[in-house]
Amino acid sequence: MIQKNWQELIKPNKVEFCTHDNPNISSVIVEPLERGFGLTLGNALRRVLLSSLRGAAITAVQIDGVLHEFSSIPGVREDVTDIILNIKEIALRMQEEGPKRVVVCKEGPGVVRAGDINTVGDMEILNPEHVICTLDEGAEIRMEFIVNTGKGYIPSDRNCVDDGRIGLIPVDSLYSPIRKVSYKVENTREGQVLDYDKLTLTIETNGAVNGEDAVAFAARILQDQLSLFVNFEEPQKEIVDESDSELTFNPALLKKVDELELSVRSANCLKNDNIVYIGDLIQKTESEMLRTPNFGRKSLNEIKEVLACMGLHLGMEIPTWPPENIDDLAKRYEDQY
């Protein structure tokens, strides 16, 4: 069946989001993953997070009395080039589509900060203490910014606005709300398998979006892009009568005896006697077990103690054991014992 190509792959049963001292940094831990999937998913999510999430940024600035970026402003300690570099670091959040125009006006002495900008609509300054420039006594400055929405990084030469205004200076725009993304892949255990993947993804944002939502958006982008490659109809699921699917015995009987952490001697004796599941074991009597080659009282007592902890004992009668589809049932109920 073609659906086994994806249905029989192990799926993560643990997704944990962790916060750090810095509220803009968070981590997501996903496990277990098939071998190699940690690298595959980690790299794909990282690239999408850094390149494809939308945000807001300043695209151009007009400063009264300034014709180009190589000018200086009387009474302002920074030259225009430094001011533009500071403007590029202003972090914004805006749900509405741009462009929007905002203004800041201030007289010296004092510091012009991002929080001094008169925002419009739902626009929010995320780093209001960020310094734009410093004014001396008697100095005055008025700046008008164009704020737009987009994704990725747009250089200043692509932000040129041909509206006839003199002195409108384009600015490099980093729209992405994601600042840094890193990931690491470690081994993790699931049942008796020790080499599944554990993925830890660490995301640093500018505050416009939290890490959990950012990962969700990136995963949705990947899902939308990859769906184009699925060229077949989803196979119809086989309808199973609920009455037939209900077990008539304890699901713990579907657990394999090699998961009981028995001594090597006891485990080998059970293996040699073709005892695979606990359901096979509990139907054996004590006398039958003692007739097993190399199986003695010490092994018998060990097994009786382990079964007692599970509410089971030797010599039990299970009329419906073994079920016909025992392997499928064991997989279905493995998380219940």
UniProtKB/Swiss-Prot annotation:
Residues covered by region (Alpha C-terminal domain (alpha-CTD)): 249-337
Check the record and name the InterPro entries matching this protein: DNA-dir_RNA_pol_insert, DNA-dir_RNA_pol_RpoA/D/Rpb3, DNA-dir_RpoA, RBP11-like, RNAP_asu_C, RNApol_insert_sf
Example GO BP: DNA-templated transcription
Entry annotated with the keyword Nucleotidyltransferase: yes
Q: In the record, what terms sit under GO molecular function?
A: DNA binding; DNA-directed RNA polymerase activity; protein dimerization activity
Catalysis: reaction(s): RNA(n) + a ribonucleoside 5'-triphosphate = RNA(n+1) + diphosphate
- Keyword Transcription listed? The answer is yes
Keyword line = DNA-directed RNA polymerase, Nucleotidyltransferase, Transcription, Transferase
Q: What is its EC number?
A: 2.7.7.6
Q: Where is this region: Alpha N-terminal domain (alpha-NTD)?
A: 1-233
UniProt GO cellular component terms: cytoplasm; DNA-directed RNA polymerase complex
Q: What is known of its domains?
A: The N-terminal domain is essential for RNAP assembly and basal transcription, whereas the C-terminal domain is involved in interaction with transcriptional regulators and with upstream promoter elements.
Per the similarity annotation, which family is this? Belongs to the RNA polymerase alpha chain family.
Q: Whom does it interact with, and what assembly results?
A: Homodimer. The RNAP catalytic core consists of 2 alpha, 1 beta, 1 beta' and 1 omega subunit. When a sigma factor is associated with the core the holoenzyme is formed, which can initiate transcription.
UniProt function note: DNA-dependent RNA polymerase catalyzes the transcription of DNA into RNA using the four ribonucleoside triphosphates as substrates.
- This chain belongs to which protein, by name? DNA-directed RNA polymerase subunit alpha
Give the organism, scientific name.
Answer: Bartonella quintana (strain Toulouse) (Rochalimaea quintana)
